[in-house]
Amino acid sequence: MSIKLQPVKGSKDLLPEEFGKHDYIISVSRNLSKLYGFQPISTPIIEYTEIFNRTLGKDSDVLSKEMYVFLDKGNRSVSLRPEFTASIMRAVIYNNLQNKKLPLKYFSSGPAFRYDNPQAGRQRQFHQINLECIGDGSPFSDAEIVLLAYDILKKLNLVDKVNLEINSLGCMESRAKYQQALVEYFSKYRTELSQDSQSRLIENPLRILDSKNLHDKKISASAPSIHDYYTIEARGYFDKVLEYLEFCGIKYTINANLVRGLDYYCHTVFEYVSTQIGAQSTVLGGGRYDGLFEQMGGKLASGKKMLPAIGFAAGIERLALLTNYTPVDVRPIVIIPVDEEYHQHGIILLQKLRNNNITTVIDLQDSISKRLNRANHIKASKVIFIGAIEMREQSYRIKDLDTSNECVIIHNELLSYLQNNCS
């Protein structure tokens, strides 16, 4: 009986070239985040399900349709993380990090899981970069997180392929008034709304604005705008965020229907979107989530009522679809001892070159011609031969595989030669 060798639907093997793209995206993001004062953090892929039940919103597609939920052997409900923010906030509360010097700035990356229909740029197992700034409630913090996202996209040469859409969901008072207006508006179209939107009408009408159903979108196009329901404070906050973005030269479009897909957002929400990757147009998105800490049971020693926070995540697969980056293969040096008696000397040289950060392999089997063929196959730049003459003269015969030229280099000059002549 044969076994299934293909990956589980919605997952895929990351082969070297694509892995190189992912690694580059993560490296660029991590390095830029360091310049902004972010530190690395890692949380488990698996969490107790209640972490997400309390944070994502029961009306969200993620919680109602897309979660990977299991009972473990102890009959505990656990889930594969569908996103990072709730896990990061859990880690903050569990490790009592909120009482350290604020703000906390964290960078993380890794896989997440959603039981969704696989398509370009979205698998059921996907990968994200994730950045969270916890403890800063200023408008500049919002602008700075958008600016960091912009800098990452710029470094990846993607700023010309995306557009920034931004909105404000206002404060709690703003949202309460706006939600009532939405209920009154959408109630007139109740029977025309999709089944999902009908169920959200009372619980969370904001989520109807995020519906992917085309008919829902047509109805939402004429819905009241949240901008008409801001308190003076909420409007002033959003205006200040936009002022900072303009000062930093960041172009944006205000999208009044942008609400993001999770319930913990408030005030600023934003997305960088592209028209080049099909239906999954959002490549990066985030926003402010000031109430999440308290919602998860967090308490501040200072007695303050709220721990403000803002962050964003970007899908690595989607960024990889857009970027033109091609991983540069490091071309190795191949050591070929011509006879077995020179194997030990070859191994000593192998370790020496690796200790000096020169990518090197050694080939000890088969004829010289077969070993040369293998060296060409792995795109080696040079071959170092070790034989009787070389041992006697304390030298190495080196063949350049691009030109087929050969030269002889004495032992103590080999390192400088390779460092100056290897691609």
UniProtKB/Swiss-Prot annotation:
Entry GO MF terms: ATP binding; histidine-tRNA ligase activity
Gene Ontology CC, one term: cytoplasm
UniProt cross-references to CDD domains, sorted A to Z: HisRS-like_core
Catalytic activity, EC: 6.1.1.21
Catalysed reactions, semicolon-separated: tRNA(His) + L-histidine + ATP = L-histidyl-tRNA(His) + AMP + diphosphate + H(+)
Subcellular location: Cytoplasm
GO biological process terms held by the UniProt record: histidyl-tRNA aminoacylation
Main localization (coarse): cytoplasm
Domain of life of the native organism: Bacteria
Signal peptide region: none
Classification via PROSITE patterns: AA_TRNA_LIGASE_II
Keywords: Aminoacyl-tRNA synthetase, ATP-binding, Cytoplasm, Ligase, Nucleotide-binding, Protein biosynthesis
Stated family: Belongs to the class-II aminoacyl-tRNA synthetase family.
Subunit structure and binding partners: Homodimer.
NCBIfam families: hisS
The name this protein goes by in its record: Histidine--tRNA ligase
